Amino acid sequence: MAQVINTNSLSLLTQNNLNKSQSSLSSAIERLSSGLRINSAKDDAAGQAIANRFTSNIKGLTQASRNANDGISIAQTTEGALNEINNNLQRVRELSVQATNGTNSDSDLKSIQDEIQQRLEEIDRVSNQTQFNGVKVLSQDNQMKIQVGANDGETITIDLQKIDVKSLGLDGFNVNGPKEATVGDLKSSFKNVTGYDTYAVGANKYRVDVNSGAVVTDTTAPTVPDKVYVNAANGQLTTADAQNNTAVDLFKSTKSAAGTDDAKAIATSIKGGKVGDTFDYKGVSFTIDTKAGDDGNGTVSTTINGEKVTLTISDIGASATDVNSAKIQSSKDVYTSVVSGQFTFADKTKNESAKLSDLEANNAVKGESKITVNGAEYTANAAGDKVTLAGKTMFIDKTASGVSTLINEDAAAAKKSTANPLASIDSALSKVDAVRSSLGAIQNRFDSAITNLGNTVTNLNSARSRIEDADYATEVSNMSKAQILQQAGTSVLAQANQVPQNVLSLLR
């Protein structure tokens, strides 16, 4: 080996090795201080890329787990509100069962309906005001997507349904609505009515003109004979009240001589008098209302038992001989109204005036009834249990003050009692139960998703750790090795730097 001064090859070699050990020592110290095997891409380019993807997944899945927990919170909030709605529906059902009992009075039904209305309003309030983080969960149909994964499309959908009184089919729910009007309702509700009722007793049929109370036997008088009229201008049509078996007497129940009353006296009074004149007949004062002519035809009236009674004498549609057999009959009294003016009573032992109540009290069968009010014609069916106007059923409604009023089918539609109220509530409860079940199932699904996300995050962290984290046993060993090499290299470098000194000995 040549002895040179300018170039110290041993020193250069030693310096190079010392630099290597210095780099190794620096890397080991960096890893030990950071805990990471990969502190920059130069440490492991491929490993750094893989670990970074793992980091993205881990962060995304961690947030997804939090999202799933939010989904559980939304479902719990919604389910809690539905539980309150369910409680209100249960109370409404309880009240409806109470309302269907026939022992309730009108005031009872009103009180029940008032509480039902409050409960229904509370359902709407809960629906409109329940929200989660500003999102109303029951006020409208909504599909809420919850991101439960680190990538696009990894979602779970919560179906939020609108739950309020209308969507539950309880809009207008009523247990105290208007009831179908009957003839009796018309009798107690109307003023200034016109029309007629027909009744049958045995083989005989009778027609009572509502506007006048005239009684005509249809079977024996094909044409209209002279009639006895009972005024019904006050609207109280009690002359045809089959349920209560009450009616206004045509005349006071007074005896008549030999079973025959002479109505010619009335005809004569009409013939000889003028409108407004009064005269007495059987102790009753009559007033001439109308006078058709000098033949005795006309109308007179009086007040009996508080009711205005009108007697009309005429020969409409028949001569005196044609209608002598026209009869008005009940099981108790029989009399005949004829143009000749004879009122003949078949029951000679009683000789009482016929009363419309007799028709009612002896099982008269109601036929079809037609009543006109302010130009509108109402029709009652044969049983008298339904009243219609122009083909639509009429209803009786009670105002807040308890006054009964007649309303038509259209007006009653919004107020009428709910058909099958218990079935309606059961349907609403079923819908609420279905939504609650769905929310319960979605909560369980979120729980499962959270568990799976946790497992995935754990495994990804482990995988990333194996790539990215520093192995302290290895790194400490590397550091110790590098430190020893540094010490040895430094010592050897000192020796290598002394080699050129040997050349000086040659110069002595």
Swiss-Prot record:
Taxonomy, superkingdom: Bacteria
InterPro entries: Flagellin, Flagellin_C, Flagellin_C_sub2, Flagellin_N
GO cellular component terms, semicolon-separated: bacterial-type flagellum; extracellular region
Compartments in which it is found: Secreted; Bacterial flagellum
Matching Pfam families: Flagellin_C, Flagellin_N, FliC-like_3rd
Keyword Secreted appears in the UniProt entry: yes
Keyword terms, alphabetized: Bacterial flagellum, Secreted
Main subcellular location of this protein, as a coarse class: secreted
Listed GO MF terms: structural molecule activity
Chain segments annotated as coiled-coil in the UniProt record: none
Comment field (misc): Individual Salmonella serotypes usually alternate between the production of 2 antigenic forms of flagella, termed phase 1 and phase 2, each specified by separate structural genes.
Function text: Flagellin is the subunit protein which polymerizes to form the filaments of bacterial flagella.
Family to which the UniProt record says this protein belongs: Belongs to the bacterial flagellin family.
Name of the featured protein: Flagellin
Name of the gene this protein is made from: fliC
